Amino acid sequence: MSEDKFPGWHGTTILAVRRAGRVVVAGDGQVSVGQTVMKGTARKVRRLNPGGHEVVVGFAGSTADAFTLLERLEKKLEAAPGQLARACVDLAKDWRMDKYLRNLEAMLIVTDGRDIFVVTGAGDVLEPEHDVAAIGSGGNFALAAARGLMESDLDAEAVARKAMAIAADICVYTNGNLTVEVLG
C-alpha cells in the first residue's frame, strides 16, 4: 500500500503455505491508522466458490479496493472455471490497464489448493518459490519465519500459525488474531 496516497495507514500480514497437498492461508486482524489500532479483528482472508471451484484469497491494502478486486477475480473465475492462473493473469491485465483499477491500493494472495499466486497492481502474477508466499507490512517477517519452519516436520497449518506469531511479535502493524483457511 502506498504511503504517499494513504499516509499513516498500515497493516496486514497475509501468508500462504503449501505442504503435503494442503494450502493454508492465514491473515492477521489488525488495521492501524498512524499509531492507533483501529480494529483488531478484521477478516482479510476469504473463501470464494465461483462455479463450484473453491478458492481462498488473502488481501493486504485498502479494504474497499481489495473487495473491488475480489469481485473482479470472482467474475474472472466464473468465466474460466477451474483456471486459476488464467483468472489471475486476466485480473492483473485489467488492473494494470484500466484507469480506475490502476489506482487501487491492494495486493492479493490467491490459491485453489494446488497453485498459489501473488497478484499485484503492477501487473505481476507471481508463483512463489519454496511453497510459501507472504504480503503486507509483516510479510517479509512471516515469509522468513515460514521458510525456516519448512525445514521442520510441522504441517502446513502449524507452519503458518507459528510464522504469523513470529511476524506479530516483530511487526507493530500485525497482531495475533488470525483468520486461517485451509484447502486440500
UniProtKB/Swiss-Prot annotation:
Active-site annotation: T12
Catalytic reactions on record: ATP-dependent cleavage of peptide bonds with broad specificity
EC number(s) reported in the record: 3.4.25.2
Keyword Membrane: no
Disulfide bonding pattern of the chain: none
Protein's UniProt name: ATP-dependent protease subunit HslV
NCBIfam families per UniProt: ATP_dep_HslV, PRK05456.1
Location of this chain's protein in the cell: Cytoplasm
